[in-house]
Amino acid sequence: MKLQRRGLLKAGLMGLGWTAMRGLAAASNSPTKFVFHVSSTPFGLLDWLRDRGYAHITAELEKRGFPSMLVHSSVRGSDTPNGDRASAVVKALQNVTNDVVIVGISNEGNYLPLVAAARPIRRVVYVNACIPRPGKPFIEVCQTEQVAVPGSYLDKLLKASQSITDDFLGLINDQNATEAHLKAMQDRIDASSSAHTLVGFYEVCPLKALPKVDTVCVSGSADDQIRPEWEQSAARRDLGVEPVVISGAGHGNIIYAKYAAELADACVKGL
């Protein structure tokens, strides 16, 4: 179905993919660069404020000899935010010859493997992040596994969107579904404040398998949105790595001053 393929096409896996191969010979002489995606605000007016949220972690990476890059793009009104974010990152890296580490926090985890499938990546870092399942939307993972912390904002969004989720999952598995059906479902998702807030959860991961790339998964022990137990279990099962647990770190504050040094250490270890 087109709903399942559009993320793949928008991520540029066949178009922009491998452009960076031209500069790989020079990469060994350049420091590894860390890349974060930042969702742009309307007209970019408050992008500077969102950028400040990354100041502590990027400063800690810089102390360790690793430059950082913030890639801005908007996902407002997008049917395929994961694919769009991946496409923006791949495009931004076209002329970058450094080795690259991409870092995803929270729902950003859903776009990371799309970038790794499109161009050479030195390392992928999931931070309190969704770990996508090839061939499935992340919302389906949330139905079969206890991803959200009970009573959390994420949990409330999932429960408020349940009827839409049920219909969506039924539709994408219906071989007789038409483009009109898919469009109507997307309109329902966009019109629902709860479902719309679950950015990228209703987008089917177009990959057949997660790319084989060096991977780090960092879990804050006090994450109040994504259950640390789920994050750590999924890291072992789906990513094949032992998660790094930062004691006391919550869902969003893990990149701020108190925990930034520990996070940076986890990100750069072994590079």
Protein language model annotation of sequence segments:
Residues Y126-K156:
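Flexible "cap/lid" loop of the alpha/beta hydrolase fold
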Residues H56-S78:
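Conserved alpha/beta-hydrolase
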Residues L70-V101, V141:
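Active-site loop/oxyanion-hole signature of alpha/beta-hydrolase fold enzymes
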Residues C217-S219:
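Short beta-strand/loop motif that positions the catalytic acidic residue
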Residues A222-I246:
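Conserved loop-alpha-helix segment in the C-terminal half of the alpha/beta-hydrolase fold
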Residues K33-L61:
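Short, surface-exposed "cap/lid" segments of acyl-processing enzymes
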Residues G7-A27:
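N-terminal export signals
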Residues A249-K258:
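Catalytic histidine-centered segment of alpha/beta-hydrolase-like enzymes
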